[in-house]
Amino acid sequence: MKNIKTSPYIPTDISIQEIGKNKIKISAYPFESGYAITLAHPLRRLLLGSSVGFAPTALKIEGAAHEFDSVRGIMEDVALFIVNLKSIRFKMRGDAERVTLDYSFKGPATIKGSDLVNDYVDVVTPNQHLATINEDATLTFSLIVQKGIGYVPSEETRNLIPEGYIPLDAYFTPVKKATYEIENVLVEDNPTYEKIVLEIETDGLIEPIAAFKDALGVMQKQMSVFNSEWSVSSAESTSSDEEDPELKPLLQKIEALNLSARSFNCLDRAGMKFVGELVLLGENELKEVKNLGKKSFDEIKDKLEEIGYPVGSDLAEEVSSALQKRLNKLK
């Protein structure tokens, strides 16, 4: 007879194997059925999204006005230059989180990642091609390199860069690849246990095992909120908005306004049930309610003024937000 477990199995085995340059395979097992995917998927997301790296976020090239331009004497147009630049992986020296780098190269020359090394940055992809300069030509450009995590599209930094610079999509993460597989393993004649096989590859900025440990650290910190001291709110406290004296008249049913049958029916057909819904409407929006005539509009306007909330009242942001939440729950 199979024994009934009283607690989940605790994994006991882990192996780490180097399978290439800046590339490792981590195997951990045995996990209860379903547990492996529960852990492997967020670990992969954290590896790709939380690892700290450095990337160019803006570029200015002398003689180029935009990313679809070209520069005389440079074989690559600006678009291809940017593609090549994104493949160059930077590492900032010191504790700075943002630096502006200025470069100028005279042709004929072939510019690679190693040519961008200076007192402020190192390059972990020194052989990556950047540009080819013809004879009698000069390539002058400036870069803004920043520290960050994950991926940040250029739209999010467009308003943060100096005038004249081209914003760039920033790939900060030093993790090039993070994949996992879930395999079954046999434990005490039970084949339903699982193994996580995780492969991690970095660009050389950090070791894969360091990236893995960083991801574990982030996961533990994210989970720590659930391990802090907390208390359970009573049901009464969760409905405290109803007791707010400023919200109370706004949460009344429209019937409380004692409108004429014509005005009430018009609002009812429009799906309006509470006084607060009318107060949140602007004057023009109320006038646009289907079949609401001028006489009914004037009546509603007068009734709302009587309770101290004229049509289009300028409610405080926190009151408006709390009212909207309560109305959504009540409807």
UniProtKB/Swiss-Prot annotation:
GO biological process: DNA-templated transcription
Stretches for region Alpha N-terminal domain (alpha-NTD): 1-230
Record GO terms (molecular function): DNA binding; DNA-directed RNA polymerase activity; protein dimerization activity
Any one GO cellular component localisation term in the record: DNA-directed RNA polymerase complex
Database matches in Gene3D superfamilies: 5' to 3' exonuclease, C-terminal subdomain, DNA-directed RNA polymerase, insert domain, RNA polymerase, RBP11-like subunit
Region (Alpha C-terminal domain (alpha-CTD)): 247-331
InterPro entries membership: DNA-dir_RNA_pol_insert, DNA-dir_RNA_pol_RpoA/D/Rpb3, DNA-dir_RpoA, RBP11-like, RNAP_asu_C, RNApol_insert_sf
Keywords, comma-separated and alphabetical: DNA-directed RNA polymerase, Nucleotidyltransferase, Transcription, Transferase
Chain segments annotated as transmembrane: none
Function according to Swiss-Prot or TrEMBL: DNA-dependent RNA polymerase catalyzes the transcription of DNA into RNA using the four ribonucleoside triphosphates as substrates.
Record remark: domains: The N-terminal domain is essential for RNAP assembly and basal transcription, whereas the C-terminal domain is involved in interaction with transcriptional regulators and with upstream promoter elements.
Protein name: DNA-directed RNA polymerase subunit alpha
